[in-house]
Design a protein with these regions (language model features):
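Cytosolic regulatory regions of ion transport systems
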Residues: 1-129
């Protein structure tokens, strides 16, 4: 069982939270939107409303204590990039971030992401098989 910090609870983040729960992991879920946080309460260990671009907020979570930090923020690349960078600066062990394009992946990898996932690209490859 791993402890996971999941940041961003849109469709992709919500599905990740469900899968991680089914696999028996402990998940702390974060989003700035109260409705999104409330939507995942039944299948995460803990959830908080907060600004992931705030160093103070992330520091209060103790990001270095999680096995994995997953950033699934979509639609606001600047927030995703800032969050990724802050996580690494604050001692995150493993940071996995979401990208929609190759150029985003390059920026994320240069700024703290250990791994990058492309949900739309990976789904397109799967559908084309």
């Amino acid at each position: 069982m791993k402890s996971i910090l999941l940041i961003g609870l849109g469709r992709f983040g919500r599905h990740i939270a469900q899968e991680l729960n089914e696999l028996g992991h402990q998940v702390m879920a974060i989003d700035s939107n109260e409705d999104r946080v409330n939507a995942v309460l039944s299948y995460v260990t803990n959830a908080q409303i907060g600004d992931s671009t705030s160093e103070y907020f992330l520091r209060s979570l103790g990001v270095g204590n999680f096995d994995v930090c997953i950033v699934t923020i979509g639609g606001n690349f600047q927030s995703s990039l800032e969050t990724t960078s802050l996580l690494k600066e604050l001692g995150a062990k493993l940071v996995v971030s979401r990208a929609e394009r190759d150029v985003q992946a390059k920026f994320l990898l240069r700024n703290g992401a250990d791994e990058v996932v492309y949900p739309e690209k990976q789904l397109a490859k799967w559908a084309a098989i």
